């Protein structure tokens, strides 16, 4: 896989970055002082990988920020990408090349983004299910309240009818009692007149 890696010449890189050849050399030197190594061919000329170009592009952008020196920017980049100092790296038995670190970092970032997307989708699905369940429960409560209201209205109407019937009966009883009293009084009056005849 390393043999298939694309390499760029200094001319290609500074054209791509929009800087001069001397600026590219200066930026490469600054990165190398911080422990990053750009490989060189048999004639001692630098050969740039895609990862090298990414770092240099980042360095160009950072160095344009207010109060940011080239050295500060290089230190930040080396720290951000976890690039060890050359001397420390030589102590390692099998140091991981920077471009592999970069690829792993990109893959990890993609995995984290995908995991976040899946978690977000799951959360939205759970929220939807919970919302649906709450809606169903609210609908059942409303239906139950509606049924209860109808029952109460029916009971109230029955009680009203019963009260009306009771009042009607009371009036009828009172009317019958009044008539009976009138009849009794009329009979008594008649008997009294008979007594005097």
From Swiss-Prot:
**What Gene Ontology terms for biological process does this UniProt record contain?**
regulation of DNA-templated transcription
Q: Which molecular function GO terms apply here?
A: DNA binding
InterPro entries per record: DNA-bd_dom_put_sf, DUF3967, MerR-type_HTH_dom
- On whether Hydrolase is a keyword of this UniProt record, the answer is no
| Segments traversing the membrane | none
Q: What is this protein called?
A: Uncharacterized protein pXO2-68/BXB0093/GBAA_pXO2_0093
Keywords in alphabetical order:
Plasmid
A Pfam family that the UniProt record links to this protein: MerR_1
